Amino acid sequence: MSMALIVRPFFVPGSAGISGSRNICKKNQWRKYLLKPSGSSINCSFSTEKNPLLPSIQQLADARLIYSVSAALGHNKESHPECSARVPAIVNALEMNELTPKFRGSQILELANFKTATVEDIANVHDKAYVFGLEKAMDEASDSGLIFIEGSGPTYATSTTFQDSLIAAGAGMALVDSVIAASRNSVDPPIGFALIRPPGHHAVPKGPMGFCVFGNVAIAARHAQRTHGLKRIFIIDFDVHHGNGTNDAFTEDPDIFFLSTHQDGSYPGTGKISDIGKGKGEGTTLNLPLPGGSGDIAMRTVFEEIIVPCAQRFKPDIILVSAGYDAHVLDPLANLQFTTATYYSLAKDIKRLAKEVCGGRCVFFLEGGYNLESLSSSVADSFRALLGEDSLASEFDNPAYLYDEPMRKVRDAIQRAKSIHCL
């Protein structure tokens, strides 16, 4: 079979630097959000009664955290960073730290049964030619055992990849369903966390890219709009790499705000600070490349000075999070200095922000993270943050690995973003 069935995504070379002069302040585009009502109260007729696979109203009322698991064990390449050991390592850490329903009863809910995403769900974001091409490629993957589906890129497929990717997208959509349903009856709904793979934020509308097959967060965003009638979606992507796929999917959409923090100059070379969206979507994309060596201080500063005011001004109906754990100082694929404590702080602050701006509606989606120890400890501490419990990051983090952050460069990047986006 010819791999021409899989469309190789467009690659934009170059640094994710801070050059560029586009500025939404000059056009007063930011003022349009002041005319919008707060997204903290929505009219949604969706009920879990319409989907017997989802939790009951009482289960949702009792839960503080809902998670789903799609480990995609068949989607695996030995020695590849994005391998089948990732999600089981997280699940094992949750068990060891007593952060599962077995130990917490109704406080934590695992969404064990959910509908698989359909081709139509995927086609809300991706070209059908790509989706059907990937499905057909499964025959070749079955014969060969493993194929590469991104031209010369690193994204692989096995015979189960297509179905595994549909399941991953469905797991995220089901959490969106559950969180929105819970918010109809509570001002403090549970947070969702999709422990899924393959990851999604690099997958562009026309094809796979950077270990990613389907854009899980992007698909969930469209699902929230089209199934539940939510209008404005705020996406936070704190993976160490720019979420170019999500960026591309919504670059002209004024109702989806995409905000990415990522290491400057890292793969895939996109995410310049001057990329603020196009057409009607100009001003609803914010890219903030961080200099190598940025860590906890940098991210906490970015959160308070960039992420919070953007969300407050945009007034979303839900926050979706591309939760990549590869900015950790121990991760082998990048050069930032996040710690387990950084991820605890991010989860805690995002939960607080969601409660302030959108009635607590928030779902996290696993993206990167390739050191199994730092990945699993950081997700476990994120769970603690979402439950309102104290961090245990000090048991894992080692200050000896850290060095001074380049805060002058960080401050320059923040000021540039503030100037461009009128913050």
Curated annotation (Swiss-Prot):
Where does the entry say this protein is expressed, by tissue? Expressed in stems, leaves, flowers, siliques and mature seeds.
The cofactor note reads: Binds 1 zinc ion per subunit.
Query: Could you say which residues are annotated as the site Polarizes the scissile carbonyl of the substrate?
Result: Y370
Query: One Pfam family of this protein, by short name?
Result: Hist_deacetyl
Biological processes annotated in GO: chromatin organization; melatonin metabolic process; regulation of photosynthesis, light reaction; tubulin deacetylation
Q: What is its EC number?
A: 3.5.1.-
Residue numbers annotated as active site: H202 (proton donor/acceptor)
Cofactor(s) named in the record: Zn(2+)
Task: Specify whether Disulfide bond is a keyword of the entry.
Answer: no
Q: Which reaction does it catalyse?
A: N-acetylserotonin + H2O = serotonin + acetate; N-acetyltyramine + H2O = tyramine + acetate; N-acetyltryptamine + H2O = tryptamine + acetate; melatonin + H2O = 5-methoxytryptamine + acetate
Q: What is its main location?
A: nucleus
Q: Where is the transit peptide?
A: 1-44
Q: Function of this protein?
A: Regulates lysine acetylation levels of plastid proteins related to photosynthesis. Involved in the regulation of the activation state of RuBisCO, which is controlled by lysine acetylation of RuBisCO activase under low-light conditions. Associates with alpha- and beta-tubulins and deacetylate alpha-tubulin. Does not seem to be required for the cellular patterning in the root epidermis. Involved in the regulation of melatonin biosynthesis by catalyzing the deacetylation of N-acetylserotonin to produce serotonin.
The protein's name is Histone deacetylase 14, chloroplastic
Task: Give the originating organism.
Answer: Arabidopsis thaliana
Q: Print the organism lineage.
A: Eukaryota, Viridiplantae, Streptophyta, Embryophyta, Tracheophyta
* Gene assigned in the entry: HDA14
